[in-house]
A protein has these predicted regions:
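12-transmembrane solute porter fold
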Residues: 1-182
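Short, highly charged, low-complexity non-transmembrane loops/tails of multi-pass membrane proteins
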Residues: 183-189
């Protein structure tokens, strides 16, 4: 699920500047300011998701988050011809909130699943999954510019949404698995 989420995020973050500038005519500064909506909502939503993981199963939070991210990315891909600033911002915010709802619970469940003496290895797995997703996402964007040069950014956003949706499905599958003891204690506290 981490690979899917980070692939989706990197693919979309590489595609969006091209999309906003080439398709809608935004300049560099406006594009940069618009894109801050994604990390800004992550800063607010990630700590909330961290608290919620003590109350709601991490699989449900992660699955819901990645589904929201997929919806935000699909909505970005199908922006109207002359979008208002708000049209772009709410879609970016939806993607960012979705990513935050996934990231904190996913990290919590992975670290809590490892025995204490293996927490360093679990953390390393998270980093490896993150970098794998980011690398594949960036490479996929380069490939799309080669294969569909006229429509690469929109295609990338749709592909990113599909990756997030795949991650969502896998995350929801965790609902059938027992929670790690550390999360059960936290939930019952």
């Amino acid at each position: 699920t981490s690979v899917c989420s980070y692939l989706a995020q990197m693919l979309s973050m590489v595609a969006l500047p091209f999309f906003l500038q080439r398709t809608f005519g935004y300049n560099d500064v406006s594009t940069g300011l618009l894109l801050t909506a994604w990390p800004a909502v992550i800063m607010v939503a990630a700590p909330v998701a961290g608290v919620l993981v003590g109350r709601i199963h991490a699989g449900a939070l992660g699955g819901t988050g990645l589904a929201a991210m997929a919806a935000g990315l699909a909505a970005l891909a199908w922006l109207p011809d002359a979008p208002a600033t708000w049209d772009i911002v709410w879609r970016l915010a939806l993607g960012g909130v979705g990513f935050a709802l996934f990231q904190s619970p996913n990290n919590s469940i992975l670290i809590a699943s490892a025995p204490p003496e293996r927490s360093g290895s679990a953390s390393g797995m998270l980093a490896t999954a993150r970098l794998t997703g980011q690398t594949v996402g960036a490479a996929a964007m380069a490939l799309l510019f080669h294969v569909v040069p006229d429509n690469a950014p929109r295609t990338a956003l749709l592909a990113a949404g599909a990756a997030a949706l795949a991650g969502s499905a896998v995350s929801f599958m965790r609902l059938s698995l027992p929670l790690p003891d550390a999360l059960v204690r936290r939930k019952n506290a």
